[in-house]
Regions:
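Aromatic-rich transmembrane-lumenal/periplasmic boundary elements in polytopic membrane proteins
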Residues: 1-56, 206-209
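C-terminal, active-site-flanking charged/polar segments
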Residues: 6-13, 158-161, 179-195, 276-283, ...
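Extracytoplasmic/lumenal acceptor-recognition loop(s) of multi-pass membrane glycoenzymes
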Residues: 31, 43, 208-211, 275-306, ...
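Individual transmembrane alpha-helix segments
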Residues: 36-92, 236-245
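Active-site-adjacent bridging/hinge elements
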Residues: 61-73, 91, 127-138, 224-232, ...
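Active-site-proximal, structured, solvent-exposed surfaces of multi-pass membrane proteins
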Residues: 94, 399, 408, 448-568, ...
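Contiguous transmembrane helix-bundle modules in multi-pass membrane proteins
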Residues: 103-308, 529-573
C-alpha cells in the first residue's frame, strides 16, 4: 500500500505513524505453533488447497463429506491462507541446533540472533508487544505487510549455520566424541520432537480446525456437525503425523551417518555425498508438493488464459480515447484479467495507492452492491436505473459494466451516466480535512460540486459563474501525457477523471499552471475563459534530480578510474 493515510479513525491504536494499519500489517502472522513447520512442513497442513486433493489423507475421510472437503482447505493454521509453509529441511534443522554447540566465534551468535529475531517478528499479532515496538520505533517497518514473509531471513541463516556445523564435523570428526552430549541434545530437539508429534499429535495441538472454519461450519446442524468435525480432525491428524514420521526418519538417517563418520566408520567423501543426496531427495519431495509437473504447461496454454471473451471484444469495439470498465462478474479487486484488456476500476496490486483503497472501502464497494442490485432489478435497462446510486463510479469515467449471466457467461452494459474524462463544476466545496472530504462525497453530486481540501484552496479557487456552453474534450492520450480541449465563455473549475499524484505537471497552452486535488482522488484546476489546450505530463522533479546525481556520480567514477590508471602507469615507468 502506497502513501500515508490522512484519515483520522477512532481506533488510534490500529494506526501507525505513517505506514499501514496494524491489523493490515499483521493479517498474515505466523502462528507460534506453526513455527514448527521449519522442522515438519505439514504441521498445519501445508497449503490452502482443497483438502480433497490430498488422496492419501482422503483414505481417512468419510465419503459422505466429500463435497465439504472440496470446499475446506488442507491448511488449518492462523493465517487467512497460504501457498505453503516455511520449511528449511529436517536434517538441516538438526545441523543448525548442533551448530550452536560445535561452531565457535561471533558468526554463530549473529546467525542465531537473526534467526530468533525473524521468528519473533513473523508471529506478528501473536506477539503483539514486540511487533508494536518495531512498528512504532523501527524506521520503514510499518511500510510492509505479511509479517510472516520475514522468515526468509531464517531460511537463509539456519542453512548457513548448518553448513558451518557440517564443515566443522567433516574437518574434525573427533568432535562427535567430544560433543556427544550436544549431539544427543540436537537429536532430541529435532528428531525427538518429530517423534513425539507422530506419537501424540493431539497432545501438542488439541484442535485441527481453524476458528474461521468453525464459524463457516456453524450453519450445519449440531447433530451432523460433531461427526464431521471428528472425521475432519482425523484426516488432518493423518496429514500431520505422516509428515512428522518423515521428518523423524530424515533426522535419524542423517544423525546415524554423522555418528558413523565420527566413529571412523565412513570416509568423508562418502559421508558428504550421502548427506547431500539425503537433503536433495528430502527437499525435492517437499518442493514437489507445491511446484509439481502439472504446473509446467506450454507457453501457448499460458497465453490462452488472457484470451478476450465476447464481452471484451464488444467493449474493445469502442474506440473512445479513454474510459474505464468495472467487472461485476468476478472478484473485482483480486483479479487482473480485466486490466489486461481494459482500463479497469478494479484489479489487484500489492502496492496500490492508499487513497484509492480508502475510496474502494468507503464508496466504490458499496456503490457496486447498489449498482448490481439496481441493474438486476431493471433487467439490464440502464434507463430504469437511478444514477444517484453510484456517483463515484460515474466520476471515475466508468463507461462499461461487465455483468454476469447464467452459465458463466457475461454481457457488457454501457453506462449512460458516466461523467467522462473531465467536466466543469458549478461549485467548489472546501473542507477541513480528509475525513470531511471523503464523507462529503456521500452528500454531493460530483457532476456539479467539487469537494476540495482547504490546503488546495490556492490551486483550486471558487467558481464565480456558470456557463451552459462550456465543454472539455480529451484529444490525445498517452499514459504519461494527456491533452484536453477546453472551451468556456467565463472560465471555471474543471475536474479531471484522473488520479491526483505528485509528479504530474499541468500546462495551459504550454504554460505551466497550478492544479490541485478534488473529490479525494481526482485532479482539478481553474481554466480561464476562451479556448485552451490543457495538458498533463508526468514529469517528476525527483527524476531530474536523481538523474543529475547519477551523471555526477558516473563522472566522478570515470575520473577515479582515469586517475588510478595514470598512477599505475607512473609506477610502472
Amino acid at each position: 500500500m502506497r502513501g500515508k493515510s490522512e484519515l483520522v479513525k477512532p481506533d488510534t491504536h490500529n494506526q501507525t505513524k505513517g505506514g499501514l494499519e496494524r491489523d493490515y500489517i499483521t493479517q498474515w502472522s505466523y502462528g507460534i505453533g506453526e513455527t514448527f513447520s521449519l522442522l515438519v512442513p505439514n504441521v498445519k497442513g501445508g497449503a490452502s488447497v482443497p483438502l480433497a486433493a490430498n488422496e492419501k489423507a482422503m483414505e481417512k475421510a468419510n465419503p459422505m463429506y466429500g463435497s465439504i472437503y472440496n470446499q475446506l482447505g488442507q491448511y488449518w493454521g492462523e493465517q487467512p491462507g497460504t501457498s505453503g509453509p516455511v520449511y528449511v529441511g529436517a536434517f538441516v534443522m538438526f545441523l543448525f541446533i548442533l551448530g550452536l554447540f560445535v561452531v565457535k566465534g561471533p558468526m554463530k551468535w549473529a546467525l542465531l540472533a537473526a534467526t530468533v529475531l525473524s521468528v519473533l517478528l513473523s508471529w506478528g499479532k501473536n506477539f503483539m508487544g514486540f511487533t508494536d515496538f518495531f512498528l512504532d520505533y523501527i524506521p520503514m517497518y510499518d511500510k510492509f505487510r505479511a509479517v510472516s514473509s520475514i522468515l526468509v531471513i531464517a531460511e537463509f541463516t539456519i542453512p548457513l549455520l548448518a553448513m558451518l556445523a557440517l564443515k566443522q564435523i567433516i574437518a574434525r570428526p573427533q568432535i562427535m566424541k567430544e560433543q556427544a552430549k550436544a549431539f544427543y541434545i540436537s537429536f532430541g530437539l529435532t528428531g525427538g520432537i518429530a517423534l513425539l508429534f507422530a506419537l501424540a499429535p493431539r497432545f501438542f495441538f488439541p484442535s485441527y480446525v481453524s476458528s474461521m472454519e468453525m464459524q463457516a461450519l456453524q450453519s450445519i446442524p449440531a447433530d451432523q456437525l460433531a461427526p464431521l468435525i471428528a472425521n475432519l480432525e482425523e484426516v488432518r491428524v493423518s496429514i500431520f503425523t505422516s509428515d512428522a514420521w518423515r521428518s523423524f526418519f530424515v533426522v535419524s538417517i542423517g544423525a546415524v551417518l554423522l555418528w558413523l563418520y565420527g566413529m571412523g566408520k565412513l570416509k568423508s567423501e562418502l559421508t558428504i555425498g550421502v548427506l547431500l543426496l539425503l537433503c536433495l531427495v528430502e527437499m525435492w519431495n517437499v518442493n514437489k508438493r507445491y511446484l509439481y509437473d502439472a504446473q509446467f504447461v506450454p507457453q501457448t496454454v499460458r497465453t490462452e488464459s488472457f484470451r478476450p471473451t465476447e464481452t471484451d471484444k464488444a467493449i474493445l469495439e469502442d474506440k473512445t480515447l479513454d474510459y474505464r470498465v468495472l467487472n461485476l462478474a468476478s472478484n473485482t479487486f483480486n483479479e487482473n484479467n480485466t486490466s489486461y484488456w481494459h482500463k479497469s476500476i478494479g484489479g489487484y496490486h500489492a502496492a496500490k495507492l492508499r487513497r484509492y483503497q480508502e475510496m474502494i472501502e468507503e464508496h466504490i464497494s458499496p456503490e457496486m452492491s447498489n449498482l448490481f442490485k439496481a441493474v438486476s432489478e431493471a433487467g439490464g435497462d440502464m434507463a430504469k436505473v437511478d444514477a444517484s446510486a453510484f456517483p463515484v463510479l460515474n466520476m471515475l469515467n466508468t463507461r462499461y459494466f461487465i455483468f454476469p449471466l447464467q452459465g458463466g457467461k457475461t454481457m457488457p452494459i454501457q453506462n449512460p451516466y458516466t461523467l467522462g474524462n473531465a467536466w466543469f463544476v458549478d461549485k467548489v466545496q472546501y473542507v477541513n480535512n480528509a475525513n470531511e472530504e471523503i464523507e462529503s462525497l456521500h452528500k454531493v453530486m460530483p457532476a456539479k460540486v467539487a469537494v476540495v481540501d482547504k490546503k488546495f484552496a490556492e490551486q483550486v479557487k471558487p467558481v464565480a459563474v456558470s456557463d451552459s456552453l462550456r465543454f472539455v474534450k480529451l484529444v490525445a492520450y498517452e499514459p504519461n501525457d494527456l491533452k484536453y480541449e477546453v472551451s468556456s465563455e467565463k472560465g471555471g473549475v474543471v475536474v479531471f477523471s484522473e488520479i491526483y499524484y505528485p509528479g504530474w505537471q499541468a500546462y495551459i497552452d504550454g504554460v505551466e499552471a497550478p492544479h490541485g486535488r478534488a473529490d479525494y482522488i481526482l485532479r482539478a484546476m481553474n481554466v480561464p475563459a476562451g479556448k485552451h489546450t490543457v495538458e498533463f505530463k508526468f514529469d517528476p522533479k525527483s527524476l531530474h534530480t536523481t538523474e543529475t546525481i547519477a551523471f555526477v556520480a558516473l563522472g566522478l567514477l570515470a575520473m577515479a578510474v582515469l586517475l588510478l590508471v595514470a598512477v599505475s602507469y607512473t609506477h610502472l615507468r
